[in-house]
Regions:
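Bacterial N-terminal signal peptides that target proteins for export
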Residues: 2-12
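Bacterial N-terminal signal peptides
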Residues: 11-21
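Lipid interaction determinants
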Residues: 5-7, 21-150
């Protein structure tokens, strides 16, 4: 009788230990997945595509940074731009304020990016190191987290 009781206690103890270990592994895995998503704020987002079309390589890659104070800044490829934004859970509203007006060679990408900055963004999505800005019709621009050049 005593051996059966000890055996049952041992089995229950092992089951509890296995359950705790599996729970800890799942929690660690979930934390790792969540940690892989870059934050919207203070990440150097490099433009990858506009309306589903990849942009060509440029000397200065078009980019945007959303700052903690509610402002955004970036480079169109030649000119710099700035404005304000408001964000909540997966929601974003951007107010473009202005840009410099230097004349540069091949401003096709710059004009396309600038035109889209005037879109009425409503949502954003971050999947690991990819930022997607969306309007009411879906994806407008896609960015990847890059390294800001010095």
């Amino acid at each position: 009788m005593k051996n059966v009781f000890c055996f049952n206690v041992l089995i229950i103890g092992l089951l509890v230990a296995i359950a705790l270990t599996m729970s800890a592994c799942m929690t660690a895995k979930k934390k790792a997945e969540m940690a892989q998503n870059k934050p919207l704020v203070d990440t150097y987002w490099v433009l990858k595509s506009v309306k589903g079309e990849d942009i060509p390589k440029c000397i200065i890659t078009p980019n945007i940074v959303f700052h903690a104070d509610g402002k955004f800044t970036g480079n169109l490829g030649c000119n710099i731009f700035y404005g304000n934004y408001y964000s909540g859970k997966k929601k974003i509203r951007m107010e473009f304020e202005g840009a410099t007006k230097k004349l540069c060679e091949n401003m096709k990408v710059e004009k396309l990016f600038l035109q889209q900055l005037h879109s009425e963004f409503r949502q954003y999505e971050i999947d690991k190191d990819v930022l997607i800005l969306k309007d009411k019709d879906g994806e407008v621009m896609r960015f990847f987290a890059g390294v800001k050049p010095e």
